[in-house]
Amino acid sequence: MKTPVWVVKSVVPQENDTLLLTFADGKKRLYDATPLLDCPAFQPLRDDSVFKAAKVERGVVVWLDGEIDIAPEHLYENSVPVQ
């Protein structure tokens, strides 16, 4: 079975609450997490040290040992291509 294109292969936290993502299709995209930070579930990400600790587990970006995650489909659909 083919891996869906929206599966995250790598994440590199950037400045200004953005994430540089590489997806299963090999494309790099930039996601701005700023709008999420007002939601109570994502408020811990306001701490820069927490935000910068993003990692990929089973194709999903997570923080705090999986306490916080963002659906990979959302990341793909709401990010912009990076040249």
Predicted regions and their residues:
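Motif-centric detector for short Cys/His coordination patterns
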Residues: 1-83
